[in-house]
Amino acid sequence: MICNSQIAEGWHGKLNLVYADRQGATQLIYNQQQAPLKVQRPFYPEAEKVCHSVILHTAGGMVGGDRLSSNIHLQPQAQALITTAAASKIYRSNGLQARQTIQMQVDPGACLEWLPQETILFNDAIYRQDLRVELATGASWLGWEITRFGRSARGEKFLQGEWRSHTEIWQQSVPLWIDRQCLRGSEDIFHSPHGLAGKPIVGSLVWVGGAVSAEIVEKTRSLWNGEGEVGASRLQHGLLCRYRGSSTSEVRNWFIDVWQLLRVSFLNRGNCIPRVWQV
């Protein structure tokens, strides 16, 4: 039963996950969840070293007033790949902000691959996401974010509302990457070359965990063969890729190719596409 206070204030979903290395096998040793967030039983499509997890949002999407809070901790040497079961939907706001906060701690020798499916902002949605990673020396993190502004398949544009996305990666109190984006829905911003340039989809992929050579950057660029606008550049401790275009499959395919390149180059792992993406 949903009480009146839940309806007025929105959901507050919580997820606390802890992964640990147990003699070369990564296990999910702690799982605390509160609806509408839930994590499926872990599985191991590439042997026990890498634990794959899928996060579910059982309510189907977020509305104004909803809060999602996730804390993910990888203990030393743990290896985890986390994705979501479906695209995240942010519905038209009732005047309140929908907000998601994600805190990650990646200990020495651990690696977290954070690969959520796209976020779809309905016109007039108000949404903010804050993601902070505490990365230990010798740890690595790869993550991406794909956002669609408006249900463009239906011809909808993001002309009202607000989107904020703040990503921070820190190591021993030193910022390795800080990315704060904000877009307010309007006709001008949707069509401006300094906004969306008429393109409803943007994406960012970030790898932090090792110096990237010029050769890797060139290979990353050569993997692109789509119609949208893209860029790839070195960070002090990794790689950044950007996309602006009109096709989710286009950006996703490029990000997957880059992810697989980085896996082979830095993690000594082969291709392993999560099954949930193929559903």
UniProtKB/Swiss-Prot annotation:
Record keyword Phosphoprotein present: no
Location in or out of the cell: Cytoplasm
InterPro entries in the record: UreD (IPR002669)
GO cellular component, one term: cytoplasm
A molecular function GO annotation: nickel cation binding
Pfam families named in the record: UreD
Subunit: UreD, UreF and UreG form a complex that acts as a GTP-hydrolysis-dependent molecular chaperone, activating the urease apoprotein by helping to assemble the nickel containing metallocenter of UreC. The UreE protein probably delivers the nickel.
HAMAP family, per database record: UreD
Function: Required for maturation of urease via the functional incorporation of the urease nickel metallocenter.
Family: Belongs to the UreD family.
Protein's recorded name: Urease accessory protein UreD
Gene symbol of the encoding locus: ureD
